[in-house]
Amino acid sequence: MGQRTPLFDLHLALGAKMVDFGGWDMPLHYGSQVEEHHQVRRDCGVFDVSHMNVIDVLGREAKAWLRRLLANDVDKLKTPGRALYSAMLDEQAGVIDDMIVYLTADGYRLVVNAATGAKDLAWMQSQLGDFDVQLLARSEMAMLAIQGPQARNRIAQLVSSARAELIRQLKPFEGLDDGDWFIARTGYTGEDGLEIMLPADEAQRFFNELVGAGISPIGLGARDTLRLEAGMNLYGQDIGEHVSPLASNMAWSIAWEPAERDFIGRQALESERAEGTAFKLVGLVLEERGVLRAHQVVRVAEIGEGEITSGSFSPTLSKSIALARVPMATADRAEVEIRGKWYPVRVVQPAFVRHGKTLI
């Protein structure tokens, strides 16, 4: 038996198929993964993401410490509520984790991956040194993600007028405190929506309200196909300690300036950049019948081989898509080995669908 979120019994009552995910018992789907996927793209749905880890960074030197810890620069965050995406690297520029960082009224809030929480916290504590910084793991909080083009409108109808106004005014990649709730306009689906951190007992009530109002519960299966269509990395598959952000479509999240900011992993990244990154993360589209899966070999004629990191059937596109790490010189065509046969694939930018629009 794995760890359970505060909503475990509600998932069972809704008929969820439960699976292990990073040591947590989580809902894979509530009947049809494909229908749940379409529901989020076309309207909205609610995910239980209480397995994610929330860590508050407090103290006089929180900003200075995070500027050393992270590849992106929290100095960009000038107004409480603003957020950014960053990798946390080791000295060899391997990705320990990726996360969202919010500037709050009294410090910073980090939202890190479920399976890496203990590892992340141990690494952070090992890097504290003499910094005047306190780390507070907010394990008492639950987290719901309401995602889809109608998410904010639907939620605004179910909360107080003051909270509804806050939701309407939130900008993308912004999160604000509202009493015991922290409401952010972020997500992992490629659609607009909210991620709400709130006390566990309130999460149960609110989840029931959402479902009672006709907002469909969505499982991890659809969450995975939604994020894959959006070209969003999954830790442990597309990124990890074995690979740098330069080979993971994450170069945009590295703050190279100011040059004197000596973040962990910078020296290794600069060496890699100077020598030239050997691999890149791309999107693949299979035009024939078949399914692209992680670890399938990608062959690029006269250049070399790579590997699929994530792959699945795309419900939106009605064809198989994948993220793959391939040689840097790869152009627009490659082949993938599926059950001993080679199939041609198109090589595209690693984003297939966002905000309901096809990008390939």
UniProtKB/Swiss-Prot annotation:
Write the Enzyme Commission number(s) for this entry. 2.1.2.10
The record's GO molecular-function terms, alphabetically, read:
aminomethyltransferase activity; transaminase activity
User: Which reaction is this enzyme known to catalyze?
Assistant: N(6)-[(R)-S(8)-aminomethyldihydrolipoyl]-L-lysyl-[protein] + (6S)-5,6,7,8-tetrahydrofolate = N(6)-[(R)-dihydrolipoyl]-L-lysyl-[protein] + (6R)-5,10-methylene-5,6,7,8-tetrahydrofolate + NH4(+)
GO biological process assignments: glycine decarboxylation via glycine cleavage system
Q: Does the keyword Transferase apply?
A: yes
GO CC annotation, single = glycine cleavage complex
- Keywords (A to Z) from UniProt: Aminotransferase, Transferase
UniProt superkingdom: Bacteria
Q: State whether keyword Transferase applies.
A: yes
Enzyme class, spelled out? transferase
Binding partners and assembly: The glycine cleavage system is composed of four proteins: P, T, L and H.
PANTHER family found in the cross-reference section: AMINOMETHYLTRANSFERASE, AMINOMETHYLTRANSFERASE, MITOCHONDRIAL
What does this chain do?
Answer: The glycine cleavage system catalyzes the degradation of glycine.
Spell out the family assignment given in the record's similarity comment: Belongs to the GcvT family.
Name of this chain's protein: Aminomethyltransferase
Which species is this UniProt entry from?
Pseudomonas syringae pv. tomato (strain ATCC BAA-871 / DC3000)
| Lineage of the species this protein comes from | Bacteria, Pseudomonadati, Pseudomonadota, Gammaproteobacteria, Pseudomonadales
